[in-house]
Each structure stands twice: as structure tokens, then as C-alpha cells.
Swiss-Prot record:
One matching Pfam family: DUF188
Family assignment from sequence similarity: Belongs to the UPF0178 family.
InterPro entries: UPF0178 (IPR003791)
Protein name (record): UPF0178 protein BamMC406_1579
Length: 150
């Protein structure tokens, strides 16, 4: 089991939690981004830089993901793709993507895209909060307790 991170938009506090978890649980955490990312020295942490371009990092994450892996992303289509491969998907706010909720999330995203393209200001997500970080940490710890190294 490895953890793959859609790192371009992942909050720094979440990356720091993942770095600590990698060392503590001795699991591989791979950050995928279209820019260079500085990571702490560890045999459990690596960074993959992909060329800039639309969905290039997402495609690389899908390529790397295997059944049982954990993918950290807020990108709903990416979450759907890794779920199709049997991986787990968690957003940085601690919310799970699942086979049960992904279609609804994709439909909501499509509707919001349509509203924005017709000129409606739909706003954006709320700023990342300490509560979001705590929710993520809790879900990550639960997942690692169940699926981490034996």
C-alpha cells in the first residue's frame, strides 16, 4: 500500500501530516506535481515531477495507483478514476470519495461548471481550516490503522 498525493493544490499542513505519517507507519508517500517540491529526507517520501499541462499529474497518479492504495486529492474526476482501479480516495478536508457518492459528486461538479460557464458566480470552497486539518488527520490515522503495514 502506498499513498499518492495530488500535490499541486494540496495544503502544506496536509503534506506535513503525510510526511510524519510516512515515517511513523513506514509507508511510501509519493507527491505528484507539475513543479518541483521540496520533501524531507526519508526513504518513505518521494516526489514525482510531471510536465506542466492539463491533467498531466492526474494521469500519472492514475497510472501509479493500484488497488488498496490511498490517493489524496480534491479532484473529483481523479478520485473517480482511482476508485475504478480499486484505490481509496480522501480529500484534504477529510472527506472520503466512494463508489456510493462519486456519481453525485461528479454530477454536482458538472452542474457547477455549467453555471460558471453561463456567467453565474458560484463562489469557491471555504478557506482550509484547522477543523479540516483535524478531520483529515483523523481519517488518515484510521485508514493507516486498518490498511498500513502489518
Amino acid at each position: 500500500m502506498q499513498v499518492l498525493v495530488d500535490a499541486d493544490a494540496c495544503p502544506a499542513v496536509i503534506k506535513d501530516m503525510l510526511f510524519r505519517a510516512a515515517r511513523r507507519a513506514e509507508i511510501c508517500v509519493t507527491l505528484v506535481a507539475n513543479q518541483f517540491l521540496r520533501t524531507p529526507p526519508s526513504p518513505f517520501i518521494k516526489s514525482v515531477q510531471v510536465p506542466a499541462g492539463f491533467d498531466v499529474a492526474d494521469a500519472r497518479i492514475v497510472e501509479l495507483a493500484q488497488a488498496g492504495d490511498l490517493v489524496i486529492t480534491a479532484d473529483i474526476p481523479l478520485a473517480a478514476a482511482v476508485l475504478d482501479k480499486g484505490a481509496h480516495a480522501l480529500d484534504p478536508r477529510g472527506n472520503w470519495f466512494s463508489r456510493e457518492n462519486i456519481e453525485e459528486r461528479l454530477s454536482t461538479r458538472a452542474m457547477m461548471d455549467q453555471l460558471r460557464s453561463s456567467g453565474v458566480d458560484t463562489g469557491g470552497p471555504a478557506p482550509f481550516s484547522a477543523r479540516d486539518g483535524k478531520a483529515f488527520a483523523s481519517q488518515l490515522d484510521r485508514f493507516l490503522a486498518r490498511h498500513g503495514k502489518p
